[in-house]
Regions:
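Motif-centric detector for short Cys/His coordination patterns
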Residues: 1-151
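Active-site environment of non-heme Fe oxygenases that use a 2-His-1-carboxylate facial triad
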Residues: 2-13, 126-158, 162-168, 173-174, ...
Length: 408
């Protein structure tokens, strides 16, 4: 290991490896240092940001790689006394002594600074951008083998990238033993709990349908139109995995519709409907003994305002208009057209889940449903929810790890 290899671990305030990207020049600009590379790319580094990201000296804890400086401690006394470049092109800053302390010298890894200059530190980095689809552009979800997802990081990476890009994928040839889904979920991240439990069943069972903790129309044989789960929550689950254990029933085909495609269609052809659906609020309410989850929001909910809005569209729990009386009529009209569009063959995929298939989808973007099925023959699925943060975190980690493996 070279001296520079040793410096990589010491200078980067996180746990990633950064290839050296020697800095060409550094200049002062008011309260910032401007770092420049030979290709002309620049990064402005405010002195407080540099001080917070100093390894040691009260900035970044070398063990946890997390900041330990309380912002209240930032002061005008934190001034840069000198700056230059090391022999290998890293940024070196000497700080004015603070009180009785000796002057601190901070070194910042050139590759770490470069990755910030390129925007690789942003939330959307290291994950694919969403691709909108409809029934003519996506004939079926991409498929991945269960055993490979569990054992091969490259396959896991491909599976998560498909899931984030399209909002849906299928994992096939999984064991049909109850509980296997928890092993697949553990490969990705923690499962999100709900009143249904960490792992829940979907089957036509009058006891499940009426139980205090499992009461839902999903546990009947009724048709379920395109919908998303748990709109009754402030933040609905990000992703849902449904594992088919048995499917001997007549009917019960699964459906998928990309909510992002519906939003594009509405904006292009019915902008008034889009405005109504994204601003008029409804109360979503879980009915059940001992259960009272409720939340008020529009059908197309911008939530954080970035990316694809959250679709809140589960009519069994959409209970009350929460809008001026004068708006209710047009809200119902827009709602009727929206659900008809979601069920339109131009947008909806229809297919049959077989034993061992696991349907994975973005619960806030992709609307799922099923056709009605008869009481003859068994149909048993198990499901889990995983929050978006966990999917994104693991996707970034495996994408960065694959990139590192492919870097000479």
């Amino acid at each position: 290991m070279t001296q520079h290899d040793l410096s990589v671990a010491l200078l980067a305030p996180d746990f990633y490896h950064y290839a050296p990207s020697p800095i060409a020049a550094v200049t002062a600009n008011d309260d910032a240092l401007v770092v420049s590379w030979p290709d002309g790319r620049q990064l402005s580094c405010h002195r407080f940001w540099l001080r917070e990201n100093t390894l040691g000296h009260g900035g970044i804890d070398p063990a946890t790689r997390e900041g330990i400086m309380d912002p209240a401690e930032l002061s005008d006394a934190m001034q840069i006394a000198a700056f230059d470049l090391t022999d290998v092109g890293d940024l070196r800053v000497t700080w004015v002594p603070e009180g009785a302390d000796e002057s601190a010298v901070s070194t910042y890894h050139s590759g770490w600074l470069r990755h910030i200059a390129e925007g690789q530190h942003l939330p959307e980095s290291w994950v694919p951008a969403p691709e909108v689809w409809n029934a003519s552009t996506l004939s079926q979800p991409p498929r991945h083998q269960a055993d490979a997802v569990l054992t091969d990081d490259d396959v896991l990476c491909d599976m998560l990238n498909d899931l984030l890009r399209l909002g849906v994928c299928l994992v096939e040839r999984a064991p049909t033993e109850p509980g296997f889904l928890t092993a697949l979920a553990a490969r990705i991240g923690p499962v999100r709990d709900s009143n249904f439990g960490l792992l829940w069943d979907v089957k036509a069972d009058v006891n499940l349908a009426g139980d205090a903790k499992t009461n839902t129309t999903a546990n009947t044989g009724f048709r379920l139109g395109p919908h998303t789960d748990l709109p009754t929550r402030e933040i609905p689950p990000g992703f849902q995995f449904l594992h088919c254990l048995i499917n001997e029933a007549d009917g019960g085909e699964s459906t998928l519709t990309d909510g992002a495609a519906l939003i594009e269609e509405l904006k292009a052809t019915r902008p008034d409907d889009y405005e109504i659906l994204s601003t008029r609020r409804w109360v979503f309410f879980n009915r059940g003994p001992g259960i009272d989850h409720r939340f008020s929001a529009p059908i197309i909910d911008p939530l954080g305002g970035e990316g694809v809005p959250t679709i809140r569209a589960f009519y069994p729990v959409r209970a009350f208009p929460d809008m001026p009386d004068a708006d209710v009529g047009e809200a119902y009209a827009a709602l009727r057209r929206f659900h008809a569009l979601a069920d339109d063959p131009r947008f909806e995929l229809t297919f049959q889940l077989g034993p061992g298939d696991i349907m994975c989808f973005d619960n806030r973007r992709v609307m799922h449903g099923r056709k009605a099925f008869s009481g003859s023959g068994q149909r048993h699925l198990q499901g889990v929810y995983i929050d978006r943060d966990e999917i994104l975190s693991t996707a970034r980690a495996v994408n960065r790890a694959r990139a590192a493996r492919q870097t000479p």
